Amino acid sequence: QVLGLEVIAENYRQERDSYKLDLRLPCGSQIELFSFANPPQRTSRPEACGLRHLAFSVDDVDQVVVYLIAQKVEVEPVRVDEYTGKKFTFFSDPDQLPLEIYQG
């Protein structure tokens, strides 16, 4: 809800003791999220190698940061990409997966 995603479906998969959540983004794209009772430990720093975070393009990073803070989300200080000159920052989802917002 904080990110404005619509829940399409949420299903419990008993054989795996896990949930699958289908979400629709405002642009119409969909994301599938899975939960697992005992996932393996892994590095989840934003700059770790491999798939370790999701990034969302936004028009105004500062405006989204104000909104997230109002929703009681802890947000890292906004940084500026040294190559593009565009703003970005990170925050964490409830499972501590880093999420990024960057200036589109």
List PLM regions with ranges.
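Core segments of cupin and vicinal oxygen chelate
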Residues: 1-29
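Short hydrophobic-acidic sequence motifs that mark active-site Asp/Glu residues
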Residues: 30-32, 98
